[in-house]
């Protein structure tokens, strides 16, 4: 699988990985594969937050579960498990994606950044600071995904309008805040990032 992954920016999702299938050895399972082939472990190499990880995963393992269960990076949350809420948003090769829509094998050879990779030592990323300063969270469950989406926005658009911020957050749901403080948090971070 190539690290040049085609990302559908409208949904923050990726196309489903389709392994090569030996047509003489199919019995009608997943993608026509035998049960043994369906669950055969696949070696992958993924750089997460600047650290290379070599692992062996089942082809059906979602990136979110690889990050959480295999690497212990539990800052990436599983909210809806249906690609609706955005709580699982990470950066894959510099793009914000919902990691519940990406198979771990699709990330083979890729660069992944999670919420744990944003801080610089003891110093929070400006977006993390903004959420603290402007009270952009309540229960906090959506916060990692919101922050990862906001960081992606500010890296590509350093001075977004309120409407651009709201549009960028369309794939992220929050049941607590009403979004006003989230938008204010991102505006605060935008100003801080432009001044530094």
Describe each PLM feature range.
Residues 13, 17-196:
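Signature of N-terminal electron-transfer/Fe-S-associated modules in redox systems
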Residues 1-8, 15, 20:
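Acidic, Ala/Val/Gly-enriched low-complexity intrinsically disordered segments
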